[in-house]
Amino acid sequence: MKALLLITAAIFIFGGCQNAATKKTDSGVPNVATDIKEVSPADAQIAVSKAYSQFIDVRTPEEYSSGHAARAVNIPLDTLTAKLDTLEKNEPVYLICQTGNRSKKAAGLLKEAGFNNVLNVTGGTTAWQTANLPMETLPPHGAPPAK
């Protein structure tokens, strides 16, 4: 009888853990799937410079214009869903933000939308800068580009 109670309790405990991993957050963004790959800034930089890949910075336009990883294109997290049709599902997609949190959310969105090869840059732009990897900046909105 005690064994039956222990087995029943274990089913409830482990069943609750499994559901928590698949629930969506309060914002409707899915929790990150376990199959999203993390990649170091150095490895991401090598990959995006050598082969066709999509490198997306999901920060706000203001954050992006103040300095971003070289070759990264700005698609803010809050507009990503609307722009999924501009991305190639079967090509690698590297995602970066400031510290890695928003890019993890973006990775979850892409995986849910059927993207096959989604990679999150560990530590985001902060780690990219710490590793002294190439950065680019944009002039302030409305300012002419530097010559």
Task: Annotate each PLM feature.
Residues F55-D57:
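Structural scaffold elements adjacent to functional motifs in cytosolic proteins
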